[in-house]
Amino acid sequence: MKIILFNIIAVYYSLSFNSSLHDFSVPVMEGGNRSLSVYSNKKVMIVTLPLQQTASADSMLYSLDTLATAHIYNLKIIAVPSVEDGYTSEQKNDLMQWYRSKLDTNILITDGLYTHKSSGNQQHPLFNWLTNDNNNGIFNVDADSPGFKYVCNSAGKLYAVLNQHTKMHGSFVQKVLKAQ
C-alpha cells in the first residue's frame, strides 16, 4: 500500500510541473538563438562539452557524433561548452572549428553557457531547469564537469541524467534512449 501511494504521489508530483525543455532557447555558437520548441516530438540529449583538445576529448566528440548519426530521426543532441569548465569568448572560434571538425551540423552547439549550480543567478535558465528538481520535478544533479548528459523525452520532460563516466557508445545509453 505504501509503495502504491508513493508511486501515485511521484507521478502526480512529476505531472504537476508545467515547464519543459521546449520552453527554453539557447544562444548558438555560430550566431543567433534557437528555441528548443523546434525539437518537440524528438528526444533531446544535452551534453556538456570538453574544452581541451585531447585524445579522450576527441574520442568523446566522435562518440557523440556517432550517436547522433545513429539516431538522426528521433534524437537531437545539444552540445554545450560550459563557462565554469573554462569556456571564454576568446576561445570561441578555435573551439567552433574543433567541434565542427568532429561533430556534424545536425548537432546543435550552443555558445558558452553557465551550467553549474554554483553560478547562482548567472546559471543559464535551461541548466537551472535541468539541474534542479524543484524545476524539473525529478532530478537534482549538477553538471559539474564536461560529459554530463541530460535526456528529455519527446514531450520535453527530463527522464535521465548520465554522468561524465557514462560512455556514449555504451549499451546503457542505448537502453536510456529506448526508454520513454
Where do the protein language model's features map onto the residues?
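Sec-dependent N-terminal signal peptides
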Residues: I3-Y13
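Structural microenvironment flanking redox-active thiols in thiol-disulfide oxidoreductases
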Residues: A57-Q123
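Loop/turn elements at helix/coil->beta-strand transitions in domains of secreted/extracellular proteins
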Residues: S40-V44, I72-K76, L103-L108, P146, ...
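Short active-site neighborhood of thiol/selenol oxidoreductases, capturing the structured segment around
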Residues: S37-M60, I77-V80
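N-terminal signal peptide
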Residues: Y13-L21
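A short beta-strand-turn-helix
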Residues: F24-V44, T66
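Thiol-/selenol-based redox modules, centered on thioredoxin-like
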Residues: P125-N128, N132-Q180
